[in-house]
Amino acid sequence: TTKAYRAHEQEQVILRRAYTLDAVLRGMSIYIDPEALLVGNQASADRAAPIFPEYAMDWVINELDQFDQRDGDRFTITEENKQVLRDIYPYWKGRTLQDKGYAAFPQRARLFYDLGIIKTEGNITSGDAHIAVDYGRVLREGLKGYRARTLEAQEKLDLTDFQDLKKSYFYQAILIVLDAVEAYALRFAELAQAQAASATPERAKELLEIARICRKVPMEPAETFHEALQSVWFLHVILQIESNGHSLSYGRLDQYCFPYYERSRQAGMTEEQACELLENL
């Protein structure tokens, strides 16, 4: 994240965030658990969590040596990773969302904050939250549908108009992110394909199916229940990677996934197989 922000300091904020997500999705550690049927990870291991320095860093540095001693939400962090965080801290000082939010406080609000009358940490240090995106539309159209609509909208812009110029940054960011999402999914397709070569016959069959699905969704419309759940999970985990995973919901998973469940059941999927996929989710 820090490398990407440094590399794109001259860009508009929305483009810096798009390039950062692109760098993360292409470069982060990925893995497939031994019996997993759905793939996609937010951190480098199960029960781990990434740090989002662009939102806030003061509290991270202040609590760095107490993470493993807290009453709740304990984390163990290596000395090496502690040093990495201390090394990037000077860059983020004054640049985080929290810093910019505090700078925008009216004088009276700042006084109330300093006195402890108001608290802002849950909102001022987080991305978009308490939302459920339109997973159903992605399942129906695939992200290639979003790409096509974005390119069409770009063609209609008049870049001599200031409002259209602002829109152009948004559309550029969409295209960067869509390419990044596709690259992320394809990384899992390649990993599953590679693992299949040394797996048991039964597991190899599962891994090859994972590879096939990851080459398809979320860019293409889903057709099966397995494809639908994998597409939803890719979108859900990437949203958490992009905006620190604060209060994101699946919404009505039962409604938008039911057509794919019904189709797969008619094609021979058993109730036990469907249940196993949901347990993976």
Mark where each language-model region is:
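Long, non-catalytic protein-protein interaction scaffolds
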Residues: 1-156
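Structured, charged N-terminal subsegments at the starts of enzyme catalytic cores
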Residues: 145-281
